[in-house]
């Protein structure tokens, strides 16, 4: 197989599930702008890079994706059929510039009525979270044009009061603060690009559930170029990989939680 020439390269911490699924989100959006886009993970010594080949001739496709997201006001709206879901924190939404529906949190792994990956509640609704995070992302982009570079896209932070909790680098432990910042609307330094793009990536690319370990999941950084249609197979390891990673969903209370740091899954 001939590896295509990438025109997007993102530094990614493979131990960070939020960054991993944000990469999946980038591939999802690139594929909608430039059908046939392919992506893969690679390692350069201790660093991992997510490559995307869009084959579109654009001089900066990553900036084009970020512009599409940040220029939309609002970025998300409630889906047309949202009234069928009575709970505000479960209502499906649409990413307006891409007409992409997000409702993965309604799809459980087992017999429940919501996904085990849903880690928000109450006022932290998908619509409110994504629009609030996008406001923060716009502020970051305003400060300098180089804030859209792949070397730092997932690491730039801004204080926000609405987030999902996909990025463990921004997560608060209840034992440290004594209360839930999400419930109290306390601003938390958050990487908006990671949170938004992970929410998008999880619509199609979901981690595998680890049996007999409650709220533990696994993902695989795939090493071969894949289009978005087959990326879900890459996530669960049906392709050449750079290894397998397992991570917990850490619940601070019965409603709020976050993705924990991943580690190499030795039993894979």
How would you label these PLM feature ranges?
Residues 36, 42, 106-107, 122, ...:
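Intrinsic disorder/low-complexity segments enriched in polar/charged and small flexible residues
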């Amino acid at each position: 197989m001939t590896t295509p020439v990438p025109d997007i390269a993102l530094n990614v911490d493979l131990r960070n599930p939020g960054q991993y699924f944000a990469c999946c989100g980038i591939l999802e959006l690139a594929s909608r702008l430039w059908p046939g886009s392919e992506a893969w993970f690679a390692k350069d010594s201790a660093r991992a890079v997510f490559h995307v080949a869009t084959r579109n001739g654009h001089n900066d496709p990553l900036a084009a994706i970020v512009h599409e997201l940040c220029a939309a006001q609002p970025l998300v709206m409630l889906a047309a059929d949202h009234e069928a879901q009575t709970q505000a924190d479960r209502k499906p939404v649409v990413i307006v510039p891409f007409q992409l529906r997000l409702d993965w949190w309604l799809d459980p792994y087992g017999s429940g009525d919501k996904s085990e990956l849903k880690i928000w509640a109450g006022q932290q609704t998908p619509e409110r979270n994504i629009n609030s995070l996008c406001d923060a992302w716009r502020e970051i982009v305003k400060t300098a044009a180089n804030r859209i570079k792949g070397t730092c896209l997932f690491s730039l932070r801004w204080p926000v009061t609405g987030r999902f909790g996909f990025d463990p680098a921004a997560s608060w432990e209840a034992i440290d603060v004594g209360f839930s910042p999400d419930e109290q609307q306390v601003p938390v330094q958050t990487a908006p690009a990671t949170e938004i793009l992970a929410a998008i990536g999880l619509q199609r690319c979901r981690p595998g559930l680890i049996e007999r370990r409650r709220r533990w999941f696994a993902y695989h950084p795939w090493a071969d170029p894949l289009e978005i249609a087959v990326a879900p197979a890459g996530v669960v390891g049906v392709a050449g990989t750079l290894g397998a990673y397992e991570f917990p969903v850490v619940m601070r209370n019965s409603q709020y939680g976050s993705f924990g740091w991943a580690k190499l899954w030795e039993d894979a």
